[in-house]
């Protein structure tokens, strides 16, 4: 095996519970991420050859592999996140399936199976080594596969000084899954020409377009009276919430959109006759379409208040991140390099928009163009998550190829 420590490194990482917590007020949101960075990652960063390794109060573990050839003038960064998504991450027991036969994979004793009839992506991996869950937790390949791949690439470069490269900066950060990990990222400290998040899915993914994103919070104020005498007096806040939602386009929902189509997504609805609350996320790719979606919500709220004769609908909109294409398309160098490297490795680049966001969405707007590379995970964020060891190895190949690339 070209990278003999990759599998064991990955298994070590995923067994540590680093689930983030969106209700927390601390950074990182969970102490487990701090402990993972300080007790697991930082010692290993030093072991694999990174220098000037340190932990920042923003939750990022940072390190540098110095250039070994002055003709490589670009400084390149690689970033992955430590936290895992909002699914059980306690006592993760990964299964290693060698030489996958293409059939059904029982997930431990859970009664759940990875079945190609349900997950057609499995057909691509016959004969490969797969790492799965035992059916009771997620796996955490999102994004501990990325961390393991970056760490392994650095280890390989340190052991092979004949591979010439420029300065490499590495950052492992918190809370990507709850959308705040990059909020406090120190771009000035990281100091690279461009970077890559290693946080994508299947082999070949290369992404530089994300949604632009906003959150919408609505409060509906009702008036509760006895239902027996409610005529022309009661205002049902729950009905107001329903009325608001019904005025959004029925086709513009996550379950009915794909590709470059945006949406409104009702995330939470709660309340009583007296008061109700609704939370939405708003997503689109183009700036004009994104702004139009937010404006449409304002128009609906204003119209309802006008019809009701009082301010019973309150809307608060907050932008979360923007499509990093706006930054990256100004200089496509990181895309051209990654694409050329993949093609040299006989990897077919898959350049498609991310129907979501990455840490790179925010970091790009901090002045460091940061597209996203594949890390290998499939079915992420749940019990059916799995990753191919061979795809992880190819990700390591790609990282090494990028840093050693000369125009």
UniProtKB/Swiss-Prot annotation:
Binding site for Zn(2+) 1: 81, 142, 199
Membrane spanning residue stretches: none
Active site: 83, 176
UniProt EC number: 3.4.11.4
Keyword Cytoplasm: yes
Main location: cytoplasm
Compartments where located: Cytoplasm
Residues bound to Zn(2+) 2: 142, 177, 381
CDD domains: M20_peptT
Keywords on record: Aminopeptidase, Cytoplasm, Hydrolase, Metal-binding, Metalloprotease, Protease, Zinc
Catalytic activities: Release of the N-terminal residue from a tripeptide
Lineage top rank: taxon: Bacteria
Cofactor: Zn(2+)
GO MF annotation: an example: tripeptide aminopeptidase activity
Free-text cofactor note: Binds 2 Zn(2+) ions per subunit.
A GO cellular-component term linked to this record: cytosol
Keyword Lipid metabolism: no
Gene Ontology BP annotations: peptide catabolic process; proteolysis
Function: Cleaves the N-terminal amino acid of tripeptides.
HAMAP family assigned to the protein according to its UniProt record, in alphabetical order: Aminopeptidase_M20
UniProt record similarity statement: Belongs to the peptidase M20B family.
Protein name as catalogued: Peptidase T
Organism: Streptococcus sanguinis (strain SK36)
